[in-house]
Swiss-Prot record:
Homodimer. InterPro entries: Aminoacid_DH-like_N_sf, NAD(P)-bd_dom_sf, Shikimate_DH, Shikimate_DH-bd_N, Shikimate_DH_fam, Shikm_DH/Glu-tRNA_Rdtase. GO terms for molecular function: NADP binding; shikimate 3-dehydrogenase (NADP+) activity. This is Shikimate dehydrogenase (NADP(+)). GO terms for cellular component: cytosol. It comes from Coxiella burnetii (strain Dugway 5J108-111).
Length: 272
């Protein structure tokens, strides 16, 4: 039986096995899907071992996305823009193909599942790390009016804006540089939720129709989404749908079939 996996450290929390099991039943495909906890300094060896044992593909989670990108022989445009891989495909010719579907998953969840329009909208992204870099390309493809990246270290936000400046209107800066305006979409992409915190955002960023979205899901997303509700945001979503949509795109890469994500999202929401 073909073998697939999610590789990370930690990996115990991953919902990907549950999601792929649901896709497996829905599409009548049979395969094994494993959780592989790779040593922090042993990612390449873990991938080789899995590949040598017949592995066909792997989802990649923290902290290995950049290393997975470097390990690949060929890469998608999104992976090249992100300098990170969210999934690998082990091809018949022995090569490794890297993709990054994080941004695709986000845009699909916002536009298809939540009916949020991104075209000609103002988008504020909080955080300038790897998570932000992974979503910028697909967000810019949606042709927003502008994207503003804000970060505790302004130079990181400026650097990301410079990398993508030819793709659309994009700015970067620190929290004290945020111009007083109401954004259509605010995306939280920092790891502060793991500590039960959220960034020092000022009041006045949220309008009556604003959408706030945390790339994390469950309890980790709660601090930011609670702030958004307190500020009067009409639409507040965590990143559970993004994860499912990401995995649906990976499933299509591996099997050539696009699964129905709605029942899987509903199933996970009922159990989380």
């Amino acid at each position: 039986m073909d073998k697939y996996a999610v590789i990370g450290n930690p990996v115990e929390h991953s919902l990907s096995p549950v999601i792929f099991q649901a896709f497996e039943k829905q599409t009548n495909h049979s395969f094994d899907y494993l959780k592989i906890k790779a040593p922090v300094n042993g990612f390449a060896a873990a991938v080789k071992k899995f590949h040598d044992k017949g592995g066909k593909g792997a989802n990649i989670t923290l902290p290995f996305k950049e290393e997975a990108y470097q390990l690949a022989d060929k890469r998608s445009q999104e992976a090249n823009e992100a300098h990170a891989a969210s999934a690998l495909q082990f091809r018949e010719d022995g090569t490794i193909y890297a993709v990054n579907y994080d941004g695709l998953g986000l845009v699909q969840d916002l536009t298809r599942n939540h009916n949020i329009t991104l075209t000609q909208k103002s988008i504020l992204i909080v955080g300038a790390g790897g998570a932000t870099r992974g979503i910028l390309g697909p967000l810019l493809n949606a042709a927003p009016e502008k994207i503003v990246i804000v970060n505790r270290t302004p130079s990181k936000a400026h650097a990301l804006a410079k990398i993508f400046h030819l793709r659309g209107e994009i700015q970067g800066g620190g929290f004290d540089e945020l111009e007083p305006m109401r954004y259509d979409v605010i995306i939280h992409a920092t790891s502060l939720g793991h500590q039960g915190k959220f960034p020092p955002l000022p009041d006045g960023l949220i309008g009556s129709q604003s959408c706030c979205y945390d790339l994390s899901y469950g309890k980790i997303a709660s601090p930011f989404l609670q702030w958004a509700k307190d500020q009067g945001a009409k639409y507040n979503f965590d990143g559970l749908g993004m994860l499912v949509e990401h995995n649906a795109a990976v499933f299509y890469l591996w099997f050539g079939i696009y699964p129905d994500t709605n029942p899987v999202i509903e199933m996970l929401q009922a159990h989380l």
